[in-house]
Amino acid sequence: MKQKSWNINLEEMMQAGVHFGHQARKWNPKMASYIFTERKGIHILNLTQTARFLSEACDLLANASSKGKQVLIVGTKYQAADLVASASIKARCHYINQKWLGGMLTNWSTIEKRLQRFKDLENKEKTGVLNQLPKKEAATLKRQLVQLRKYLGGIKYMTSLPDIVIIIDQQKEITAINECITLGIPTICLVDTDCDPDLTDIPIPANDDARASIRWILNKLTLAISEGRYNSIKTE
């Protein structure tokens, strides 16, 4: 698919503040080729580069989802958490938006057991079994359920390792990125001017702090996922 099909509009990106980087003194020199200029001590990203890599990411996601591949979106910073949840639910993706638990991918067998525990407790809650238990035991199990729902609710239906992982903030989610590298799982990552683009398969140069920027990029990525899935259903 060509870039045009994703309706990537430079003016819209500017309105969303996608082009604003960090203070120039905090930059990572590896981001030099993605930076357009510096204004008042702030680096400005080259949106032509952003459009190019975003288009590439959308192509990959559309193709993957048309083949039934699973996508995980990770964004636990407060600016991104609710945006990640809503975009993921809309596109029927898995997501982590509270805290990355170490080993979430590299120790998947343990996470699988926790997910089973989560489902068992949810079932007991729905069927009223929890309320039939002694108060102390019921309270303990309900606390467990609250914690499991908070941290694992977004991957409740993930039955295997994801095929592609989308990362919202490279520095915040470095543990997740390292786990993906270890397992050879392809990553798509928003990279601000203080990031290392070499750590991800498809770096998307973008403001990873502003909600409007995160929302705009997420909308494009999840639209590609939904479109890929829709095209798959259409051709069946």
UniProtKB/Swiss-Prot annotation:
Q: Which Gene3D superfamilies match?
A: Glucose-6-phosphate isomerase like protein, domain 1, Helix hairpin bin
Q: Can you cite an annotated GO cellular component?
A: chloroplast
Q: Does the keyword Oxidoreductase apply?
A: no
Q: Which GO terms describe its molecular function?
A: structural constituent of ribosome
Keyword annotations from UniProtKB, A to Z: Chloroplast, Plastid, Ribonucleoprotein, Ribosomal protein
What does the entry give for GO biological process?
A: translation
Cellular localisation: Plastid, Chloroplast
Which InterPro entries does the UniProt record give? Ribosomal_uS2, Ribosomal_uS2_bac/mit/plastid, Ribosomal_uS2_CS, Ribosomal_uS2_flav_dom_sf
Q: What family does the Swiss-Prot or TrEMBL record give for this protein?
A: Belongs to the universal ribosomal protein uS2 family.
Note the NCBIfam families from the entry.
Answer: rpsB_bact
Quote the protein name from its UniProt record: Small ribosomal subunit protein uS2c
Origin organism of this chain? Physcomitrium patens
